[in-house]
């Protein structure tokens, strides 16, 4: 138990250090909408607290999440509207940069025959209603209220249970193929095998992965499908093309 507590304490200490590093290097990292934000003496909520509160969010209301982070349900150092204002000062890229620094501080050690196994997939995330944000609005039918969503594309190290990269897109502007290309272009780690579902089976994706020296395993649509790329691979051939593979 003591060992686990020490590990958690060390990780939290590292997180604090990396968040502070990102803030101290804000002029070159481009993480704030204005570099003067969070510099006023006596400010109720620091850059670190704002970042850590957002990182710790679950699915509860904002007041409850704030209470949980500050460990006091009756007295908070900042109001709900004040926190929203503080959060809006930080660019999304700040969280990606903190994630990158944490991943570098704790290198992934597990691999499969020398390769990291990186799964790429996307998922929708519900967000608060904002009538001005047409890019995130999901139309649910004539007699149904619209919902507001973001599309989250993630790169996940399967063997090390670690998120490596992320691309956030507005619901109506989502492009999973572009997200895969962006994440594969940014990846600078050890040799890897990128694993993706059939919606990623596109020549452009494969070309980008190959250009960067990555291996890939991408599920494809059935050969008889109208948009299946397998038609070009097995054109003129007959019979079955299945091949037995070992499962990790």
Name each model feature, range by range.
Residues 1-248:
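Conserved, well-structured functional cores that handle cations and Mg-NTP chemistry
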């Amino acid at each position: 138990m003591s060992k686990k507590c020490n590990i958690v304490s060390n990780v939290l200490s590292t997180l604090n250090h990396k968040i502070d590093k990102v803030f101290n290097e804000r002029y070159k990292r481009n993480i704030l909408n204005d570099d003067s934000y969070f510099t006023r003496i006596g400010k109720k909520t620091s850059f670190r607290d704002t970042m850590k509160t957002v990182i710790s969010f679950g699915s509860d209301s904002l007041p409850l999440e704030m209470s949980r982070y500050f460990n006091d349900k009756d007295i908070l150092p900042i109001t709900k509207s004040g926190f929203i204002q503080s959060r809006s000062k930080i660019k999304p890229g700040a969280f990606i940069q903190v994630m990158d620094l944490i991943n570098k501080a704790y290198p992934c050690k597990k691999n499969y025959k020398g390769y990291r196994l990186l799964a790429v997939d996307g998922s929708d995330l519900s967000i608060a209603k904002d009538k001005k944000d047409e890019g995130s609005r999901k139309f649910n039918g004539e007699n149904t209220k619209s919902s507001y969503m973001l599309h989250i594309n993630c790169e996940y190290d399967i063997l090390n249970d670690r998120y490596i990269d992320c691309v956030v897109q507005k619901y109506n502007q989502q492009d999973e193929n572009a997200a895969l290309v962006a994440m594969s272009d940014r990846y600078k780690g050890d040799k890897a095998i990128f694993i993706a579902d059939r919606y990623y089976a596109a020549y452009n994706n494969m070309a980008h992965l190959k250009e960067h020296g990555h291996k890939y395993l991408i599920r494809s649509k059935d050969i008889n499908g109208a948009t299946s790329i397998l038609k070009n691979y097995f054109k003129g051939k007959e019979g079955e093309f299945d091949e037995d593979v070992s499962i990790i």
